A protein has these predicted regions:
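Acidic, polar-rich N-terminal leader regions of halophilic archaeal proteins
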Residues: 39, 255, 277-278
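Intracellular alpha-helical coupling/juxtamembrane segments of multi-pass membrane proteins
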Residues: 167, 217-250, 254-260, 264-268
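Active-site phosphate-binding and catalytic loops of NTP-dependent enzymes
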Residues: 272-274, 346
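ABC ATP-binding cassette signature C-motif
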Residues: 1-227, 281-529, 535-600
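Alpha-helical coupling/stalk and coiled-coil linker elements that connect catalytic or binding modules
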Residues: 239-248, 276-282, 290
Length: 600
């Protein structure tokens, strides 16, 4: 394969930091490369160097002769140009629509948008789609995409992954993409570059395969590095013990051993930056969370129906993912549950013990003039963790990645990912027992996302999450609902796969209106599903129920231990016994659901 872009010993600094240090890499025809790394470690800088927009401080960047590079930046400079000028150079519809690729991109990304309108009248998400469409249509040899899935829903992300994978399979150029969307990276990329800091200098490690292969390969590298470090420490202990005994003088061998011992001390590898989210105490949650009866929710002017005559019961420990195309009202549903919006009709009953933590897409609750440490100490200077240990605000922040001068940095000077991290930490300080999370993955790097997912795995409360990040959704939620339009909120036993399949079936039905579709045989049944598809759906639903049963068994075991420890505290014992009874009732309901599902 021909090399299209080469980096030779490239170094780039920013202030006192070295973001890239003597990095040598190549992009060849047919490559599909995913770039991962912590926020601020130099991913966007690397893209700028690859495209030629950023000159390195030293080293060389070469492009093959006549190379065309399409670059999707995180911002744009379209000014007041029309959408048609940006994406198809002003060509009329009958000209650009003759090209099937252009037509597909416009239909998928810009459906319903007037191409003769001005870009400066669009929302941020719509501008992002215009920029992405322009790059995809441009006929470039290399596509360099910085966070292309931002502002896209799961359906469009799935289309984009298929579009880019088809381009790579046809060997029509190369792709380099920065994304925090791990499902997307796994679906599209065949190579992964990790940008990280080693000894204060930015480096790039290359791994074969997509995100899943990268995780396994990195874990193996870390295991080998840990083994080597263990050997180094054992040898160092022996050498230091020998030095403490006092080496005999006037021989060459002791001089050699002293030098070797000093080298062992000097070569201690620096620790990789890590992010730790401490486990906070959680307020006790009773048996009632949310009960919706005959709810109708309308938003906007003129009123648009989001929910119509919906009955929905959400219990303790439920973990729900909510999906739907952009604009269907997912955020409005969360705001209604949080009490910020009132239903147009019907009732929303909230449990007496609810303590809701609502993570909004906006960061309005953060005062940009506050310093990071003050923003946490204003909530709590000392926090009690789940195990009873107390911890200071400064230590909490340092564990969660706010080290050094970041503690005294003003919030307005933080990156989007850092502000989102701070927002999540402040939310947990209030010890909520219900979390409503609206696009929680926005701006966060993969390491931080993994830490939050691990935290939510063991969190005992109720979680309702809206996200376009399919990996996060499937990791955090046990059940998926979809806002499908017309006021409906449908349970999807088959998860996101069923949602995408149903949406594809709806599009096909609209294109062939005379074709008759068999009626659904029950709630959650796929439209005209084959026996094999039905078996897959049932298997997935059984797996979901079994996962919930496993979690409840763990909670019951923990309650038994707590009851044994509180044997002499009759008040606490009664509280624990009530919780145990509720868990056992939930377990019974789930076992009944399992039997019904298994019977088909």
């Amino acid at each position: 394969m021909a090399n299209l872009i080469n980096l030779e010993r490239v170094t780039v600094g920013y202030g006192t930091r070295v973001l890239l240090h003597e990095v040598s890499l190549g992009v060849a025809d047919g490559d599909a490369i995913g770039v991962v790394g912590r926020n601020g470690d130099g991913k966007s800088t690397l893209l700028g160097v690859l495209t030629g927009e950023r000159e390195p401080d030293s080293g060389r960047v070469t492009h093959t002769s006549g190379l065309s590079v399409g670059y999707l930046r995180q911002g744009d400079d379209f000014g007041d140009a029309s959408i048609r000028e940006v994406i198809v150079a002003g060509r009329p519809d009958h000209v650009w629509a003759a090209d099937p690729t252009t037509r597909e991109v416009v239909e998928q990304l810009l459906g319903g948008i007037d191409l003769d309108g001005s870009v400066d009248t669009l929302s941020g998400g719509e501008r992002r789609r215009v920029a992405l469409a322009a790059v995809l249509i441009g006929g470039h040899d290399v596509l360099v995409l910085d966070e292309p899935t931002n502002h896209l829903d799961v359906e469009v992300i799935a289309w984009l992954a298929a579009h880019l994978s088809g381009r790579t399979a046809r060997r029509t150029g190369a792709l380099v993409v920065v994304s925090h969307d791990r499902w997307f990276l796994d679906a599209v990329c065949t190579t992964t570059w990790e940008v990280h800091s080693a000894s204060g200098k930015g480096t790039v490690d290359a791994y074969e395969g997509g995100y899943a292969a990268y995780v396994l390969a990195r874990a193996e590298r870390m295991r080998l590095a840990a083994t080597a470090e263990t050997r180094r420490r054992n040898l160092l202990r022996k050498e230091l013990a020998w030095l403490r005994r006092g080496p005999p003088a006037r021989t060459s061998k002791p001089k050699f051993r002293i030098q070797a011992a000093n080298e062992l001390i000097a070569t201690e590898p620096p620790p990789r930056d890590s992010v730790v989210l401490q486990r906070f105490a959680t307020s006790r949650l009773g048996k009632d969370v949310f009960d919706l009866h005959g709810v109708r929710l309308e938003v906007g002017e003129p009123p648009r129906v989001v929910l119509d005559n919906i009955d929905w019961s959400i219990g303790p420990g439920d973990r729900i993912g909510l999906v739907g195309v952009n604009g269907t009202g997912k955020t409005s549903v969360l705001r209604m549950l949080a009490g910020q919006l009132q239903p147009t009709a019907g009732t929303v009953k909230r449990g007496a013990t609810l303590k809701i933590g609502y993570l909004s897409q906006a960061l309005d609750e953060l005062d940009g003039s506050d310093r990071v440490l003050d923003a946490v100490e204003n909530r709590r200077r000392i926090t009690e963790l789940a195990g009873g240990r107390e911890i200071s605000a400064a230590t909490l922040l340092e564990d969660f990645g706010f080290t050094g001068d970041k503690l005294t940095t003003r919030i307005a000077d933080l990156s989007g990912g850092e502000r989102r991290r701070l927002q999540f930490l402040r939310l947990l300080l209030d010890e909520p027992n219900v979390l409503l999370l609206d696009e929680p993955t926005n701006d966060l790097d993969i390491d931080t996302l993994t830490v939050i997912e691990d935290y939510l795995d063991g969190w005992p409360g109720t979680v309702i999450v809206v996200t376009h990040d399919r990996y996060f959704l499937e990791r955090v939620s046990d059940v998926t609902y979809a806002l499908t339009g017309g006021g409906r909120c449908d349970l999807l036993p088959g998860g996101v796969d069923q949602y995408l399949s149903d949406r594809a079936g709806d599009r096909a039905a609209r294109k062939a209106p005379t074709a008759k579709s068999p009626a659904a045989t029950g709630a959650g049944a796929g439209k005209g599903e084959s026996p094999a598809a039905r078996q897959r759906r049932i298997a997935k639903e059984l797996t979901r129920i079994e996962g919930q049963l496993s979690k409840i068994d763990g909670q019951i075991a923990a309650l038994h231990e707590a009851m044994a420890a509180a044997a002499s505290d009759h008040v606490r014992l009664a509280e624990l016994n009530t919780e145990l009874g509720e868990l056992q009732r939930r377990k019974t309901r789930l076992e009944e659901d399992w039997l019904i599902t298994a019977d088909g």
